[in-house]
Amino acid sequence: MDHQLKQLQDWISESRHIVFFGGAGVSTESGIPDFRSVDGLYHQKYDYPPETILSHTFWEENPEEFYRFYRDKLIVKGAKPNAAHLRLAKLEQQGKLRAVVTQNIDGLHQAAGSKTVYEL
């Protein structure tokens, strides 16, 4: 493991065109729930699965239910960027990181200072 970590550090120090691809694992340290873990949103009981509730069609047909789910499960008051968010922002400021591509829609990358963030 130490060898792998050292290799990653070397790659980062030598690189100038890093693109970070991330997902829920980055923000779980900030208290944001994920979808697939044991405690994730997929394992909680709702009338619909999360991917249905978060669809455009569901929003059009059931706006009250959509906003209730969003408010209750996706907005985490007090969530702050964690060490990963902050380190990625620092790499961008250093000119090493070109972009963050993420499945997260929590805004924590931007709150940490990242400018080029693509939320999928």
Locate predicted features:
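Conserved catalytic core of sirtuin-type NAD+-dependent deacylases
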Residues: M1-L120
